[in-house]
Every structure is written in C-alpha cells, then in structure tokens.
Amino acid sequence: MTIDINGNQEDISAMLIGAERYALGRRTYIVQWTCEFIGNNLHLLTEKDKGVMIRDIEGAIDYGDECDEACWKALLSKLKGV
C-alpha cells in the first residue's frame, strides 16, 4: 500500500533522524526495522541528514547486540553509497 504524507522532504528526513537516534544502541526489534526502513527509503533523506546519520552511526558508543551492530553497519554502507 502506498500512502501520501503531508510535509516536505526536510520534515520526513528529520523524522527519520529521530527514528535512527531512538533506535541506535537499543537491543530490540526496532533496530532492524528502523535500519531496513531507512535503507529502503534513502530518497527521503536530505544530503545533510545522510551526513548526520553517518556521523551518528560512526560515533556510536554502543550499537547494541552483535545482530544490531550488523544492521547499523549495513545501513552505514548504504548511506555512504558503498
């Protein structure tokens, strides 16, 4: 199902930053869900916010469990275009 969202790219991009920051370091299902959603919707991020996410993920003190770290590193690669 496709949905329409009221707002502009900057609004959506900022909300995705909030989701990333909420999930970073947690040890729950939300990590995988967040990483997959952001990774599959990179077109919704501004270039500035991609840079913010890269900085957040690279500077994380704790990624959570090993499976969470793998999710974050996979998202980081996507954000960097690797």
Where on the chain are the PLM-derived regions?
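Short terminal alpha-helical segments
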Residues: 1-31, 35
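Short linear motifs centered on Gly/Pro in flexible linkers and helix caps
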Residues: 7, 36-37, 52, 61-64
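Short amphipathic alpha-helical heptad-repeat segments
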Residues: 7-15, 45-57
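Charged, low-complexity interaction regions
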Residues: 21-29, 42-50, 62-70
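Amphipathic alpha-helical segments within well-ordered protein domains
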Residues: 35-42, 58
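Amphipathic alpha-helical binding modules
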Residues: 56-82
